[in-house]
Amino acid sequence: MSGSVTEFLKPRLVEIDNVSPTRAKVTLEPLERGFGHTLGNALRRILLSSMPGCAVTEVEIDGVLHEYSTKEGVQEDVIEILLNLKGLAVRLEGKTEATLTLVKSGAGPVLAGDIQHDGDVEIVNPSHVLCTLTGEAELSMRIKVEMGRGYVPASTRRSSEEDDRPIGRLLVDASFSPVSRISYNVESARVEQRTDLDKLIIDMETNGTIDPEEAIRRSATILAEQLDAFVELRDMSEPVEKEEKPEFDPILLRPVDDLELTVRSANCLKAEAIQYIGDLVQRTEVELLKTPNLGKKSLTEIKDVLASRGLSLGMRLENWPPESIAEKD
């Protein structure tokens, strides 16, 4: 094996085994001895505690004043209903919170798919059972879903919201992490004559709101960004000149024509007065689909072109448009 003894081996992704749509095994090798546990434990902790996601935070059920009561015609008690709501997998697009409505009557199970919502909300597990109705009972509830990170118990919010919270609004312990299970294993690896290397195998499962492969990618990005501070350590006694960063990425200031979309897609955007890429990325999928003559095929094209440039729909740009563009318009 060539190279200096002081140089570290650079690992590579050997295999990504998608066991199911929500579970994957990722193999990374070769790693220097000990680095398997170092990286595996760091990624595991980030995936469990620091990944952003959505969770139910508040619930209102007609006829229910507190969580220790029961609802006539509902097989489960209120506490069990709240526990089932914790298993609701929701994806929000272009917003950080949403209030969902559920109205169901008649005997039978009440499913997550029975929840009414707008186009910016996606119920990922519509077959998830929330409760069971008996007889001709009717159930009506309002469910608040928020984006967050980590685990936030209801008790931490109850003290601060006690005075303003209406009677009957039930607070729920919120686990925002989209990762439901993760483990890692370190095995031996070999490169030429070296047999003391590590192979890291990460086995993880999500609630379906994020692809397992994408979750690992994001956790690695979070870890790298945190470590950047150590890479950029400087002598504090030396003044550091601050570089003036442009307010917006230059690509956002370019006209939409630079994306080289098909004539149909380009004309649809011009008809909506979407002149710059910065204008486009702030639109959501739902908003674009309301554009006359712009169908799902054109929407897919726009998303793919933006993705190739590291952009996406539904982005938020503070202080847009900049003065340079506003003056032109």
UniProtKB/Swiss-Prot annotation:
Homodimer. The RNAP catalytic core consists of 2 alpha, 1 beta, 1 beta' and 1 omega subunit. When a sigma factor is associated with the core the holoenzyme is formed, which can initiate transcription. Belongs to the RNA polymerase alpha chain family. This is DNA-directed RNA polymerase subunit alpha. Residues 1-234 are annotated as: Alpha N-terminal domain (alpha-NTD). Residues 248-329 are annotated as: Alpha C-terminal domain (alpha-CTD). It comes from Pseudoalteromonas atlantica (strain T6c / ATCC BAA-1087). It catalyses: RNA(n) + a ribonucleoside 5'-triphosphate = RNA(n+1) + diphosphate. NCBIfam families: PRK05182.1-2, PRK05182.2-5, rpoA. SMART domains: RPOLD (SM00662). It holds the Pfam family RNA_pol_A_bac. Its EC number is 2.7.7.6.
